[in-house]
Amino acid sequence: MNQKAVQKINYAYLLLTIFVPLVLIGVMGYIGATFFREGGTGAVICFMLPTALAVVWWIFGPTTIWRLRKKAMEQQLDQQGFTRNQTFYGSNHTVIVDIRKGMIALLFFWNPFVSFILPASRVTKAWTDDGAAGSGFLRGTSRVSFLFLIDGIKIRVDTFTSNQRWKMNDEHVLTGISKADMWVQVLAEAKEASELRDGTH
């Protein structure tokens, strides 16, 4: 069990992910300009290869790490006897709940090397945000989420997102709201089970 406060972002990891490729481009560019002033294959390698590798890293690196770390966390949970009753794979969060034991496991995209396995009693509030905006026939949403507070930190997990506004009675929106409501209920049940185990309920 992780007793540390939840941390959604590891800023060292975030900065390394962004800036290490830039440093590589700068260093190799300097080498190319210094030692291959007349061009040629060496200059092409120094200028083009690091840029290509950086782009590939930015596109695939963090997402590959994220995917591998999710699998590693699931294996860790299984080894610990954590029953994965409900799992939600968000773009930036993974939330897994063992309802009977009242436990929650969290993994964050920008802090992928630390999995937080916590008693659900640390959740102080959980709710659905349908993202509704506008009025009349313009009323709609482009984002539906369930949110919860744990250790005073707000965690938002999207169940529906779009780059345009959808009407509130649209099937996709209603499905997103239904998923969010279900997760609020799951968190409430896990919290109750956790408090019963702790003798605080």
Language model feature labels by segment:
Residues 2-7, 39-103:
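Anionic N-terminal interaction surfaces
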Residues 21-28, 51-55:
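Hydrophobic alpha-helical transmembrane segments of multipass integral membrane proteins
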Residues 78-87, 125-128, 132, 198:
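Short secondary-structure junctions
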Residues 100-141:
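Phosphoinositide-binding peripheral membrane targeting modules
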Residues 127-201:
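Acidic, Ser/Thr- and proline-rich intrinsically disordered linker/docking segments
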